[in-house]
């Protein structure tokens, strides 16, 4: 049966069939952090804080647009004065907006232990003077997830918005994390927290995870009219 989202147990199967520690770690981070493939592949050893049990995610989907706090004019990183209203661009203002491109996320002990083992084994790859956790490109990341899905015997998924059927991809692990989070806490505060965790600029993007193949509406209706004992319909 074709469905829209993976279950957490299915993602765990992906991890179990991974070919090596690197591939298992990639699957683990994509799911446990709910990060984008570009963010996972951009991780460096310096982003891992073993003492505080955190990972700093660099938001790579799009560069944050700096803007004037007075007139909202778009600013370049080198601007010291707004080209539209002439207001001075304080360094602290630019740095504050720049920090919004990062998310510092807590990590569970099991995942942290896996990261530590991977680093101690010499897994990270040096590029341009920096140690990247994975050192692979986006295409290879997709290949790893797809190969794990085939090996685990997972079905293809259907896009709930377009109806198109597609293979299991890295982003589907992010989807799984988000759906699981909403199922456990769909309060206003919970959705806001998820928005911040996922790095969504628009909360509308986060809200779509509440619409899981119509199940939410069905559950709501059944709470209004609960089935009586013995009903077969």
PLM regions: where:
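Flexible interdomain linker/hinge and immediately adjacent N-terminus
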Residues: 1-12, 58-61
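Short, basic (Lys/Arg/His-rich) helix/loop patches that form interaction surfaces
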Residues: 16, 123-128, 143-196
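Basic, Lys/Arg- and aromatic-enriched nucleic-acid-binding interface segment
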Residues: 8-33, 37, 126, 185
